[in-house]
Amino acid sequence: MHKDGRWAREILQLQKPEGHWGYFHTLSETKKFPVTTEQALRRLEILGYTLEDEPIARAVVYMLDCLEHRREIPDRREKLHDWDVFTDLMLAAWIRRFTGDCPAANRVAERWAGVITKTFATGEYDSAAYIRSYENTFGLKPAGGRLTDFVSFYQISLLIDALDEKTERAMVTYVLNHEAGIYNLYEKILNRLPESFASREANRYLSAVELLAEYRSGRESLHFVADWLEEQQNDRGIAGL
């Protein structure tokens, strides 16, 4: 894979002038929109695209317009979620993948950081504290799987560099031991290595681990993964964490 390769060109050809790729999140109408905006952003990020690249800069401007309600993402409102809270969460998380200098996205991160700080105030996850803090922050009780359980790609990505050391360490420990893994990335416990390295499951596992490794305390907790990668390195030439 290469930044100027075929895969990148195919994705960039699908980008709309406004900066999006069609639906932001919804996996439907694939003939109309072959890729969602977040799928395109994830692939371009993997290929090494940054805010300095015009397609990403244009996408970030679009997402900021949506976050500040000058535009709306075209996805159908999902009734099973707190849609407005969820939309702000998605947009802010993706903006912060590419820049930490967006006040609107950082405000969303600060609100979620407040929720998570109260959730882990005792050093361990407190479900009642999470629900109470969420309701106090957002004005309603959490609804929908991605919000009643905060361990999804969006929250974990959004909160990088947003938590104090004590809260971060407690949260990382909780996520590593979370039986359902990280929603949207790898939905098995992260403290258990995949059975096969050469598998799609291992690829998904490494995506989740790489996200968690972006936390200061994440790398300290992931030595067992680094050891596993080192075992594979001689035969496969895989770089460690």
Task: Tell what function each PLM region has.
Residues M1-L241:
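Preference for long, amphipathic alpha-helical scaffolds in soluble/luminal domains
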